[in-house]
């Protein structure tokens, strides 16, 4: 494990100021292809490859940016256009936790209004606790502001599609279109006059762009074609998702997460009577969960949240001593453990599973190319930050590109792309490392490690300024 973490740390560091790295970035990105630009090719200022949540939001943000009013933007999406004529009464099992920072981005180009007019559920508190002890941490806001929102991915996608249609004169969307080849010129200088990226689509057509943005997922074709190294490994876990019905209606404004020895289980509010499940566990157990009958599955969920079977007297006694000491030092505002709502049933056909892993690109940018979202990083869902990291990438990249456009600079120049990389690698690397450490620390019931994490969680819960810093970091 130490070797792996050391390897990860070495590859995650930002090395763009090294002259050797700059020379490498200026080299050919696809060695087997020669620069074959044609004056007949359609030319775009920006091409976004990948029309998922992050790619579509990127195109939206650029299309609505005042300094891009005279730019041509293209969004490539391999799938068909998704129409949402009427909101289904059944909730989707794929949801995202949207942070305040992400709502600011979505509001900046009008998508958040569409989301609020459809459906989303705010949560004002988050309780995280250990199944092997009484340790917990409660995140909340004294001013009663919302900590975040749980939104179905389909709803977010609908809102983004509506806002893309609003800027159709600036942003062209090609559905059922996928790039199958990229050509960069050979070694060239960092000057603004460097040649553009040449893209071949599946139908044989070609185009050119001043900046290619890869938003095509953790198996990114843009990243691979650019020859950007990616540190990645698969976790020994899959995530089980489902839509759950509560036993009784509640205010349901708390997000719950409990760390089990096999992985974390989370309950995210959807409405007063519904919640979304994300249960990370071993591949074998995940397969069992999705194949169980409904009653057995519901019992397994309630037991996972309520049972104290993993407790030991020794750890409970040590935990109680620390808890009493904290109460003496800080007799007020110590969060008390609450219990999550019980589950009554599960929506039919809402159960699904997907494998988990970690990934991080050693570089986010090369001349005329930038990576965002899962193309640049992949994270465990225990942090609830996957799409928020991607939206954070967008906020940073749009800021740098907007400044470049305002100043009449070349959009594909490294002079501002490296600013984006520095901003986001600093944030994302810290979050990835912390999440990976938590995943490993809580994937054991060994007494010494249980004690260590118990005391750490209790201490963190008692220090309000530290919790505020954690919430502020996660809200970006």
From Swiss-Prot:
GO terms for cellular component: cell projection; extrinsic component of mitochondrial inner membrane; Golgi apparatus; mitochondrial inner membrane; mitochondrion; ubiquinone biosynthesis complex. Keywords: Cell projection, FAD, Flavoprotein, Golgi apparatus, Membrane, Mitochondrion, Mitochondrion inner membrane, Monooxygenase, Oxidoreductase, Transit peptide, Ubiquinone biosynthesis. The modification N6-succinyllysine is found at residue 219. The keyword Membrane applies. Component of a multi-subunit COQ enzyme complex, composed of at least COQ3, COQ4, COQ5, COQ6, COQ7 and COQ9. Interacts with COQ8B and COQ7. Residues 1-35 form a transit peptide. The lineage of its organism: Eukaryota, Metazoa, Chordata, Craniata, Vertebrata. Belongs to the UbiH/COQ6 family. GO terms for molecular function: 2-methoxy-6-polyprenolphenol 4-hydroxylase activity; 4-hydroxy-3-all-trans-polyprenylbenzoate oxygenase activity; FAD binding; oxidoreductase activity, acting on paired donors, with incorporation or reduction of molecular oxygen, NAD(P)H as one donor, and incorporation of one atom of oxygen; oxidoreductase activity, acting on paired donors, with incorporation or reduction of molecular oxygen, reduced flavin or flavoprotein as one donor, and incorporation of one atom of oxygen. Its EC number is 1.14.15.45, 1.14.15.46. Expressed in the kidney, in podocytes. The gene is Coq6. InterPro entries: FAD-bd, FAD/NAD-bd_sf, Ubi_Hdrlase_CS, UbiH/COQ6, UbiH/COQ6_monooxygenase, UbQ_mOase_COQ6. It holds the Pfam family FAD_binding_3. Its cofactor is FAD. One of its GO terms (biological process) is ubiquinone biosynthetic process. It is found in: Mitochondrion inner membrane; Golgi apparatus; Cell projection. It is a peripheral membrane protein. It catalyses: 4-hydroxy-3-(all-trans-decaprenyl)benzoate + 2 reduced [2Fe-2S]-[ferredoxin] + O2 + 2 H(+) = 3,4-dihydroxy-5-(all-trans-decaprenyl)benzoate + 2 oxidized [2Fe-2S]-[ferredoxin] + H2O; 2-methoxy-6-(all-trans-decaprenyl)phenol + 2 reduced [2Fe-2S]-[ferredoxin] + O2 + 2 H(+) = 2-methoxy-6-(all-trans-decaprenyl)benzene-1,4-diol + 2 oxidized [2Fe-2S]-[ferredoxin] + H2O. Gene3D superfamilies: FAD/NAD(P)-binding domain (3.50.50.60). Its main location: mitochondrion. FAD-dependent monooxygenase required for two non-consecutive steps during ubiquinone biosynthesis. Required for the C5-ring hydroxylation during ubiquinone biosynthesis by catalyzing the hydroxylation of 4-hydroxy-3-(all-trans-decaprenyl)benzoic acid to 3,4-dihydroxy-5-(all-trans-decaprenyl)benzoic acid. Also acts downstream of COQ4, for the C1-hydroxylation during ubiquinone biosynthesis by catalyzing the hydroxylation of 2-methoxy-6-(all-trans-decaprenyl)phenol to 2-methoxy-6-(all-trans-decaprenyl)benzene-1,4-diol. This is Ubiquinone biosynthesis monooxygenase COQ6, mitochondrial. The keyword RNA-binding does not apply. Pathway: Cofactor biosynthesis; ubiquinone biosynthesis.
